[in-house]
Swiss-Prot record:
Annotated family: Belongs to the Ycf4 family.
Localization in the cell: Plastid, Chloroplast thylakoid membrane
Protein name in the entry: Photosystem I assembly protein Ycf4
The keyword Transport appears for this protein: no
Transmembrane segments: 21-43, 63-85
Gene Ontology BP annotations: photosynthesis
Length: 185
């Protein structure tokens, strides 16, 4: 969702609460429970869940490996669920032409630096950069180059949904709003 007026441009970012992350967290959790239950069933010598027959599986080495995969999958699944719960990566970009200030805010992982808040003067913005990498894994990333600070990504690196036309359009609109040049690399 974006909001624009003559002097202010606010762009909200979704973060990790995406449909794909929910899907993979559920699949990983259920698959890990299946692996772990088969490993435990092979250790006990009886079926815990009737759908997953495991009496033919020896505990050593198959049951041990299944248990290990189940535990590892539960750890990865819990990491995904925590990023979804904390909404890591969400935030906003606010460009205020009237005040001459750019504010970038992102939520991170819990801790001292949970809130990432960057603030710049508009006159320090040198350019808007577009990085385009085509091939098997295409990447189109929009950056803002700040004098003395380097480059700051404005779009997420996993946003593969931008077509070349969309990223060019977004860069052109932002460069026009900020009155800075566009660079492509």
């Amino acid at each position: 969702m974006n909001w624009r007026s003559e002097h202010i441009w606010v762009e909200l970012l979704k973060g990790s609460r995406k449909r794909g992350n929910f899907f993979w967290a559920c699949i990983l959790f259920l698959g890990s429970l299946g692996f772990l239950s088969v490993g435990i069933s092979s250790y006990l010598g009886k079926n815990i869940i009737s759908i997953l027959p495991s009496q033919e599986i020896l505990f050593f080495p198959q049951g041990v490996v299944m248990s290990f995969y189940g535990i590892a999958g539960l750890f990865i699944s819990s990491y995904l669920w925590c990023t979804i719960l904390w909404n890591v990566g969400s935030g906003y970009d606010r460009f205020d032409r009237k005040e001459g200030i750019v504010c970038i805010f992102r939520w991170g992982f819990p801790g001292i630096k949970r809130r990432v808040f960057l603030r710049f003067l508009m006159r320090d913005i040198q350019s808007i950069r577009i990085q385009v990498k085509e091939g098997l894994y295409p990447r189109r990333i929009l950056y803002m180059e700040i004098r003395g600070q380097g480059i700051i990504p404005l779009t997420r690196t996993d946003d593969k949904f931008f077509t070349p036309r969309e990223i060019e359009q977004k860069a052109a609109e932002l460069a026009y709003f900020l009155r800075v040049p566009i660079e492509v690399f």
